[in-house]
Amino acid sequence: MIFDSHVHTMFSSDSDMKISDAISKANELNVGLILTEHLDQDYPDKNLFKLDIPNYFNNYSKYKNNNLLLGIELGLTLPSFNIINEKAKKFNYDFILGSVHAVYDEDIYIDYCKRNDLTEKEFFHNYLEFMLNVVTKYDSFDSLAHFDYPCRYTKFKNNEITLFHHNEILDKIFKILISKGKVIEINTRRLDNDDTIHNMIDIYNRYKELGGKYITLGSDAHNINDIATNFKNAFSITEQLGLKPIYFKNRKPEYF
């Protein structure tokens, strides 16, 4: 079965999707789901994205089966490294998705994307440099999510992270991930745009050239209409490049 390995329900501060609705939609689409509720320990608003993990498991364990798995999306930051690692180890997740939602102490959506003192190249380089720092430091995740996350929100004329401008640092990131046995996500949110798809093909091809073999697929759905969105285009990329889509169960890779 195909799995959407990046889905948020009402246990994430930015979603009000009910698990029952998510399950119904997944059944309709014939896809499995891994719920990846947000835990962003250093988020600027201390009341948001602080997942109550015991409550999450207490409420959702009854829904867990071969087609519905329980994971978490960890915001990888430096100040709370020890706390985040402890929470990653303490509970029996099926899957841990690692994400970069901030550049050092600046949340990307709230603050970093509003900066007007950086060129396009500087903006993306700083983000990728921080990503390199955290993937080097952290071992407590299985797949790295949406490396193109800031591209959703920036207003540059060329709104893509490209190999042409960032090949050296992307190589470093991919080599670290591969050496640690981590994989990367094809996040499908932006795969409705031909320019984005072509750019993604270049970047994922480089991941493959460096020894990457596997990817996870994630819609980053926060509502039922986005579950498994653009998966057809994602499969086109994996087939073209010879990358193998996988999902995780009990922190172990499984094949579609």
Say what each PLM segment does.
Residues M1-L78, I83, K87-D94, Y153-F164, ...:
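An N-terminally biased module of ancient metal coordination in phosphate/nucleic-acid-related enzymes
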Residues D16-M17, H125-N126, E168, H198, ...:
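Residue-level recognition of alpha-helix initiation/capping sites
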Residues I23, N27, V135-T136, F174, ...:
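A structural alpha-helix within SAM-dependent methyltransferase catalytic domains
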Residues I34-L35, L97, A145, E185, ...:
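Conserved beta-strand positions in the central sheet of alpha/beta enzyme cores
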Residues H38, H146-Y149, T188-R189:
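Short, well-ordered beta-to-alpha junction loops that form the rim of enzyme active sites
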Residues N47-S179:
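Extended substrate/RNA-proximal surfaces in nucleic-acid metabolism proteins
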Residues K137-S140, F248-F256:
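A cross-taxonomic marker for long C-terminal extensions/tails that follow the last structured domain
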Residues H165-I227:
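Active-site-adjacent C-terminal substructures of enzyme catalytic domains
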